[in-house]
Curated annotation (Swiss-Prot):
Pathway: Cofactor biosynthesis; biotin biosynthesis; biotin from 7,8-diaminononanoate: step 1/2. It catalyses: (7R,8S)-7,8-diammoniononanoate + CO2 + ATP = (4R,5S)-dethiobiotin + ADP + phosphate + 3 H(+). Substrate binds at S42. The gene is bioD. It comes from Clostridium botulinum (strain Alaska E43 / Type E3). Catalyzes a mechanistically unusual reaction, the ATP-dependent insertion of CO2 between the N7 and N8 nitrogen atoms of 7,8-diaminopelargonic acid (DAPA, also called 7,8-diammoniononanoate) to form a ureido ring. The active site is at K38. This is ATP-dependent dethiobiotin synthetase BioD. HAMAP family: BioD (MF_00336). Pfam families: AAA_26 (PF13500). Mg(2+) binds at T17, D55, E116. Homodimer. Its EC number is 6.3.3.3.
Length: 227
């Protein structure tokens, strides 16, 4: 039976893909069969007239995963907009059943699954007669969250508000990772201390341009839960 975790963030462009890639890389370098999955990707790359899931390609490259990265993303859109708007622009119906089926397929191929979200935690995935929010997917997959946040000014507010929203939806958060952390920045240092005290969660850091995630392997594995 596979174990999974969901990587989400306090906002878009916080560094989910970067952190996800480092996590998958760390597990795979420890000879752990870890895979990657993303339900919906917008803002895809066009290479040689072919659409490419850029986030997935990045994770594959960093973590040295072989194969076609498009196969680990259920829906891929070219427009760099919210998933629900991308689906509307392309007249595509996003199906929860397909997401679950694709996720289960990845699970059958791996022992650990790292799932990357889209945007921040409050992200409409499909918004028509049927409505799917990102939190609906997380609850359907029944896996806990690692929350990625910024390290700088405003991090406390954004992190606490995100955690309150997650708590409202009865989803477990295992840890927080502060991205682009500067060990010499007094704001970053204080944010980490305050967030640990306010949330009672372990708060890890990832310095800019890091090639490894600063989380002990034993602790990282504990954040994954059985699916």
């Amino acid at each position: 039976m596979a174990k999974g975790v969901f990587i989400t963030a306090t906002n878009t462009d916080i560094g989910k893909t970067y952190i996800t890639a480092l996590i998958v890389k760390k597990l795979r370098e420890a000879n752990i069969n870890c895979g990657y999955y993303k339900a919906v990707l917008s803002g895809a790359e066009i290479i040689n007239n072919n659409i490419v899931a850029g986030d997935a390609k990045y994770v594959y490259n960093v973590a040295n995963i072989k194969g076609n990265p498009n196969k680990c993303v259920s829906y891929i859109f070219e427009q760099p907009v919210s998933p629900h708007l991308a689906a509307k622009l392309n007249n595509v119906h996003i199906s929860m059943d397909k997401i679950v089926d694709d996720f289960n397929y990845i699970c059958n191929e791996h022992d650990y699954i790292t799932v990357e979200g889209s945007g921040g935690i409050v992200c409409p995935i499909y918004y028509d007669k049927e409505k799917i929010m990102l939190t609906d997917i997380i609850k359907k997959l029944k896996i806990p969250i690692i929350l990625v946040s910024s390290s700088g000014l405003g991090s406390i507010n954004g992190t606490i508000l995100t955690l309150e929203y997650i708590k409202k939806h009865n989803i477990t958060v295992n840890s927080i990772i502060l991205n682009n952390y500067d060990k010499n920045n007094i704001i970053h240092i204080d944010n980490r201390i305050i967030l640990e005290e306010m949330t009672n969660l372990p708060v890890y850091i990832c310095e800019q341009y890091s090639k490894d995630i600063d989380i002990p392997l034993k602790e990282l594995k504990q954040f994954y839960d059985f699916i």
